Amino acid sequence: MGKLIWLMGPSGSGKDSLLAELRQQEHEQLLIAHRYITRAANAGNENHIALSQQEFFIRAKQNLLALSWYANGFYYGLGIEIDLWLHAGFDVVVNGSRAHLSQAQARYGTSLLPVCLTVSPDILRQRLQTRGRENDAEIAARLERAAHYPPFNCHTVNNDGSLLQSVERLLILMGRKEEHYASL
């Protein structure tokens, strides 16, 4: 059975960039799952599958979603296909939710690897301002929310530096790459 890597972090921490970089690299037995979201396909940077609320509810009713939740005005889901991939021995990386980690832990137990992507408040503010999706009040609210969801019961990857460093750290946590220490 593979591992489900539940990648969490505040909006603007770089989850989508990290997942996009991981998709560009070749890793055997590693898949990045798309989320099903009731948000337009061109909204934001996330590579997701856009569904209407009706489509989402039909999939949920037919047990086609392994996990689902509601946040920020949208419904989010992970397709049941991730269970097939895990049972086939693939490690699966998903863009998870900090608030719904317990739901993932209940379903996947020891197969779950919770990873929190962290970023310093100043860099987070700068990234949110640069992407231009939120106004000042919304940015303040996102910063406040980020402060109330510190990493807990999870491995951390600091994303203040380069994206490639963050990807390397994630691969080390997943056991897909050895950590090399510089000799002193």
Swiss-Prot record:
Keywords: ATP-binding, Nucleotide-binding, Transferase. Pathway: Metabolic intermediate biosynthesis; 5-phospho-alpha-D-ribose 1-diphosphate biosynthesis; 5-phospho-alpha-D-ribose 1-diphosphate from D-ribose 5-phosphate (route II): step 3/3. It catalyses: alpha-D-ribose 1,5-bisphosphate + ATP = 5-phospho-alpha-D-ribose 1-diphosphate + ADP. One of its GO terms (molecular function) is ribose 1,5-bisphosphate phosphokinase activity. ATP binds at G9, P10, S11, G12, S13, G14, K15, D16. One of its GO terms (biological process) is organic phosphonate metabolic process. It comes from the Bacteria. It is an enzyme of class 2 (transferase). Its EC number is 2.7.4.23. The keyword Nucleotide-binding applies. The keyword Zinc-finger does not apply. NCBIfam families: phosphon_PhnN, PRK10078.1. Catalyzes the phosphorylation of ribose 1,5-bisphosphate to 5-phospho-D-ribosyl alpha-1-diphosphate (PRPP). Belongs to the ribose 1,5-bisphosphokinase family. This is Ribose 1,5-bisphosphate phosphokinase PhnN. It comes from Salmonella arizonae (strain ATCC BAA-731 / CDC346-86 / RSK2980).
